[in-house]
Curated annotation (Swiss-Prot):
This is tRNA pseudouridine synthase A. GO terms for molecular function: pseudouridine synthase activity; RNA binding; tRNA pseudouridine(38-40) synthase activity. Keywords: Isomerase, tRNA processing. The gene is truA. The lineage of its organism: Bacteria, Pseudomonadati, Pseudomonadota, Alphaproteobacteria, Hyphomicrobiales. The keyword Nucleotidyltransferase does not apply.
Amino acid sequence: MPRYKLTIEYDGAPFFGWQVQDTLPSVQGALEAAVKAMTGADLRVHGAGRTDAGVHARGQVAHVDIEKQFPPGRFRDGLNAHLRPHPIAVLEAEIVPDTFEARFSAVKRHYRYRIVNTRANLALDIGHAWRVPRRLDSDAMHAAARRLLGKHDFTTFRDTECQAKSPEKTLDQLDVLRDGREITIITSARSFLHSQVRSMVGSLVWVGEGRWTADDLSAALAARNRAACGIVAPPDGLYLVKVDY
C-alpha cells in the first residue's frame, strides 16, 4: 500500500479548521472526499499541522495510504480536479517510505503572520491579514520578540484548551519585518502550542502600540498564566508556510 506525501496550500477562510468536522466544512474533510472520489475508499489524510478555523497554508504537508498506486503527477492532478471549487490546491504528490509521518517526522514548522498597519479599510486583503489602524513601532516589536526566543514555558501564550502534554517549547525564530504599511512576523519551531503564534503576535502588537514594553512581555512570559497574555491575533493573517523534514 503506497504512502503519498502531499504538499498543500489553501485559503482557510471558508473552513472550520484543518480537522474533519461532522457537519462543518474542513480542509481535511475536503481532501478525504477527493481521495475517496479517486479511490472509492474512505481513507484518513494525516496533516502536519491542525490549523485553526480561518488559518491559511502555503506549505501544509499531509500523507495518505492508498491501495492503488498512481503516478504521483496523476494523483496530484486527480485530487486537484476533485477539490474544485474548494480553495485548496495540491502542489505536489510524491511516494514516500511508510515510515514517513506528516506530523511526527517533522523537524521544524514555519509560520508567517501578516499585519496591514493602516487606517484605511482592507479591500483585497480582507480575510488574509489583520488590519491594525494604530501606528505600530515594528522596531520595538522586533526587539521585544528577542525575549521569547529559546526554550521556555509558554503557558501564557497557549489556549486554555491546549492538549499538549508540556507547555515547554523551543522557539527558533521570531522576526518582525516592515515593508511600507505591511508588517510580517516570521516564526519557526519544531512545534507550537495551540494558539501560541496568534497569542505571541497579539502581545507584540501591544508592544508596537506602546501599551506594553519589552519588559512587560517578559513578565507575561514569566507569569506562566494565560490571563497575563495580551490580545490574541485573529486567524486571518496566519499562514503555515513550510514544514521541514
